[in-house]
């Protein structure tokens, strides 16, 4: 068995473990700091919405264009007066996105691009997206996200309890905020692929959280009938028992996404992969973090505020104090007995061998001598 497998077995049986719940304030602080940074980035820089959401034009040139991406981007911005995004496709053609343009402007931009690129205007394909259609798509995307969140909370409240539903909801908001904030900070374009990535990472984060919650539900069944563990301690054991599984699942999911983001988008220059791969990469990492460090410790906080759990904690601590007192008294009695049994250092050595007794004067009187008379 591998070392990781051995560690997983020891974590599952409670032989080793890290106290996530005890140190929850540290993880809460880290999450709050990251979330504030994401919100500030979102407020200052804002999201770079794609033309699918704000409207605009997309121009596609013929294959095997010799013009560079940077030069084409400069020509497109000069022709339109707006920011342009240029991507070189696999067949050598150029894809030029310009937001905030209408039909009349797109015709003029198309003429200017044909002159700069030395290509006939008829060979440049132009697709227009109206701003009203983009707003409609954006509104439907947000509505779909909101409906998803509501359904998740209802399901968790029915399958588990409302405290777990609330903790899972907080974890999902945590993951969305961090992912959207990272998008704002790096300046990547928000496209329908980004929305797909967000929905995907929400499902993954929810799955990872439900795995821990299911283990917690099983281990806390009839918890008030015992006086060995508190709810927080059982919650911590649930995290540790599923820790290796969560790590393995996260690593396996992150590897192909990292390949899309860093190799496909970064090294090979396939920029269209960035919109979905970045949301998946950040969201998967944030989801794994929130399911371990946020959701379950938050459930422990909410549960231990209940009167039953408070009474259980008092009984557990009282029993431990009583056991510790008995252990100390037994240990002190054993030490005292051992001290009394020890001889002092200056004691004379014990006499070993036959004991010399004084001779009796009347020894042999009245007894037959054994001689014949």
UniProtKB/Swiss-Prot annotation:
Family per UniProt? Belongs to the SecD/SecF family. SecF subfamily.
- UniProtKB keywords: Cell membrane, Membrane, Protein transport, Translocation, Transmembrane, Transmembrane helix, Transport
Protein name (database record): Protein translocase subunit SecF
Q: How does it sit in the membrane?
A: Multi-pass membrane protein
Gene3D superfamilies from the entry? Multidrug efflux transporter AcrB transmembrane domain (1.20.1640.10)
Q: Which gene encodes it?
A: secF
Q: Which stretches does UniProt call biased (Basic residues)?
A: 362-373
Q: Which regions span the lipid bilayer?
A: 26-46, 142-162, 166-186, 193-213, 251-271, 280-300
User: Compositional bias (Acidic residues) at which positions?
Assistant: 333-346
User: Which cysteines in this chain are paired by disulphide bridges?
Assistant: none
């Amino acid at each position: 068995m591998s070392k990781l497998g051995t560690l997983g077995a020891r974590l599952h049986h409670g032989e080793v473990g890290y106290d996530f719940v005890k140190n929850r304030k540290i993880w809460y602080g880290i999450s709050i700091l990251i979330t504030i940074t994401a919100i500030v980035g979102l407020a200052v820089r804002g999201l770079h919405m794609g033309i699918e959401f704000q409207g605009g034009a997309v121009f596609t040139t013929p294959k095997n264009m010799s013009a560079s991406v940077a030069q084409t981007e400069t020509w497109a911005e000069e022709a339109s007066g707006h920011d342009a995004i240029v991507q070189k496709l696999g067949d050598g053609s150029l894809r030029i996105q310009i937001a905030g343009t209408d039909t009349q402007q797109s015709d003029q931009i198309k003429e200017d691009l044909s002159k700069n690129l030395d290509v006939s205007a008829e060979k440049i394909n132009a697709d227009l997206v109206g701003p009203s259609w983009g707003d409609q798509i954006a509104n439907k995307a947000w509505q779909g996200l909101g409906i998803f969140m509501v359904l998740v909370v209802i399901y968790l409240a029915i399958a588990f309890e409302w405290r777990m539903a609330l903790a899972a909801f907080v974890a999902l908001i945590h993951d969305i905020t961090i992912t959207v904030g990272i998008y704002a900070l790096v300046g990547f374009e928000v496209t329908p692929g980004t929305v797909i990535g967000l929905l995907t990472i929400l499902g993954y984060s929810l799955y990872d959280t439900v795995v821990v919650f299911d283990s917690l539900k099983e281990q806390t069944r009839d918890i008030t009938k015992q006086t060995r563990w508190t709810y927080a301690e059982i919650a911590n054991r649930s995290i540790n028992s599923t820790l290796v599984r969560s790590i393995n699942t996260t690593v396996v999911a992150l590897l192909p996404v990292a390949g899309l983001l860093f190799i496909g988008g970064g090294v090979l220059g396939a920029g269209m992969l960035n919109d979905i791969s970045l949301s998946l990469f950040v969201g998967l990492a944030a989801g794994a973090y929130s399911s371990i460090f946020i959701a379950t410790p938050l459930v422990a906080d909410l549960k231990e505020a209940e009167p039953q759990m408070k009474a259980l904690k008092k009984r557990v601590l009282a029993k431990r104090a009583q056991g510790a007192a008995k252990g100390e008294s037994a240990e002190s009695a054993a030490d005292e007995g051992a001290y009394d049994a020890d001889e002092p250092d200056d004691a004379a050595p014990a006499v070993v061998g036959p004991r010399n007794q004084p001779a009796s004067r009347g020894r042999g009187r009245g007894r037959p001598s054994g001689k014949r008379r």
